[in-house]
Design a protein with these regions (language model features):
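Conserved glycine-rich cofactor-binding loop
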Residues: 12-14
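Conserved glycine-rich Rossmann-like NAD(P)H-binding loop of the short-chain dehydrogenase/reductase
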Residues: 26-43
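Catalytic Tyr-X3-Lys loop
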Residues: 92, 99-118, 136, 153, ...
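Alpha-helical segment proximal to the catalytic Tyr-Lys
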Residues: 126, 168-173
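Short C-terminal tail/terminal secondary-structure segment
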Residues: 145, 222, 226, 232-246
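Short, small/polar-rich loop/turn modules that mediate ligand/substrate recognition or access, typified
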Residues: 172-176, 232-233
């Protein structure tokens, strides 16, 4: 089987799903990880398999649980007998002011955003070394300039940025490790939805004066995995220039 294989966490919807589609279009086979969005994950898998048979599979796992992380890595590496890329996209995001944050908040946010990427990569190391593969970590522009009332989230993403650079040094020359930091691409949903006034305030500080598209992120990930063999240890901000005004 000559098609490269990518494991994408949190790939049932939003940026993860767009990344799976983009890599698939470029000839990759994809392992679609999901936690609770089984219907969306299976719909995506079936759509990709219709365009290219046996090229996508979905796997469930709670990335805050160590056993699930180990199982997901094993399944991803064994399904096609190889693994060429790990995309750490899954993330937990919600406010937790310091005076109100609980140990459960710490476990959930740090577990999903920092601990899981570390140990998932650890389990995938043999396969990635064999394939001379790549790792992409989805970070955030708030890893450098924190968002108010989100100390745990910002700390987790700052930690992931540090891991990105550390791994790039430690795992070279066998494995390249880079990061992508999205700006205003898709507004948060549900309880974390951003009101229109706040959206406009963010866009007013964005030189491109608009939101980005999910394909902007997926394209950046594809570039770093497919077209940048001499790039490692870099974190690419895809934010319309927003980080210039933070």
């Amino acid at each position: 089987m000559d098609n490269p294989v990518a494991l994408i966490t949190g790939a049932a919807h939003r940026l993860g799903a767009h990344t799976a589609k983009t890599l698939h279009q470029r000839g990759w086979n994809v392992v679609i990880h999901y936690r609770s969005r089984e219907t969306e994950a299976r719909d995506l898998m079936e759509s990709l398999n219709q365009s290219r048979p046996a090229s996508a599979v979905c796997k469930q796992g709670d990335l805050t649980q160590s056993r699930d992380v180990a199982r997901l890595a094993e399944q991803a590496c064994q399904h096609w007998g190889r693994l060429d890329a790990l995309v750490n996209n899954a993330s937990v995001f919600y406010p937790n002011p310091t005076s109100e944050a609980t140990e459960d908040d710490w476990q959930q946010i740090m577990g999903a955003n920092l601990k899981a990427p570390f140990f998932l990569l650890q389990h995938c190391l043999p396969a990635l070394r064999e394939s001379k593969g790549g790792v992409i970590n989805l970070i955030d522009i708030y890893s450098e300039k924190p968002l108010a009332d989100h100390p745990l989230y910002c700390a987790s993403k700052a930690g992931l940025a540090a891991l990105t650079r550390s791994w790039a040094k430690d795992l070279a020359p066998d494995i390249r490790v880079n990061g992508v930091s999205p700006g205003a691409i898709l507004w948060p949903e549900g309880d974390q939805a951003v009101d229109p006034e706040h959206q406009q305030a963010i866009l007013a500080k964005t030189p491109m004066a608009r939101t980005g598209q999910p394909d902007d992120i997926a394209g950046a990930i594809a570039y770093l995995l497919c077209d940048a063999p001499f790039v490692t240890g870099q974190i690419l901000s895809v934010d319309g220039g927003r980080s210039l005004n933070m």
